[in-house]
Curated annotation (Swiss-Prot):
This is Mediator of RNA polymerase II transcription subunit 9. The keyword Translocase does not apply. Belongs to the Mediator complex subunit 9 family. GO terms for molecular function: transcription coregulator activity. It comes from Kluyveromyces lactis (strain ATCC 8585 / CBS 2359 / DSM 70799 / NBRC 1267 / NRRL Y-1140 / WM37). Residues 95-123 form a coiled coil. Transmembrane segments: none annotated. It is found in: Nucleus. Component of the Mediator complex, a coactivator involved in the regulated transcription of nearly all RNA polymerase II-dependent genes. Mediator functions as a bridge to convey information from gene-specific regulatory proteins to the basal RNA polymerase II transcription machinery. Mediator is recruited to promoters by direct interactions with regulatory proteins and serves as a scaffold for the assembly of a functional preinitiation complex with RNA polymerase II and the general transcription factors.
């Protein structure tokens, strides 16, 4: 019984992948006054640099440090879980095809299981 409760507490590999992807999503999409979206921040930084190129506080490196930090954190998380890399490497079209294949496979397994149940009930 102790082994069963330990298994229930450990997340499955699918849950671990989902947790990694959730953490990456949170890192890359945080919205607050200090962490804005990537594109507007880059646009603003480039505009400021073009307006005042000699101002030392208008460095692209300084302006984009938060973006680089968030991307490095996401990259580290991805490197820790090869399955997560596979998940994010497919295009939406590839995922649609993959989902269709899995649905067909599941239907076949369901039909096979139903036939097995029927044959067991006959005995």
């Amino acid at each position: 019984m102790t082994g069963d409760t330990e298994k229930e507490q450990e997340p499955s590999s699918g849950e671990q992948q989902l947790n990694v992807l959730k953490r990456i999503h949170e890192i890359l999409t945080k919205h607050s006054s200090t962490q804005t979206e990537f594109i507007p921040l880059l646009y603003h930084s480039l505009k400021q640099i073009s307006k005042h190129p000699n101002n030392s506080s208008n460095s692209l490196d300084a302006a984009t440090s938060s973006i680089r930090h968030r991307l490095k954190t996401a990259k580290t998380l991805l490197q820790q879980d090869p399955a997560a890399i596979e998940l994010v490497s497919k295009t939406p079209e590839q995922w649609q095809l993959h989902i269709q294949e899995k649905k067909i496979e599941l239907e076949k397994k369901t039909k096979h299981l139903q036939r097995l149940r029927e044959s067991i009930q006959k005995q």
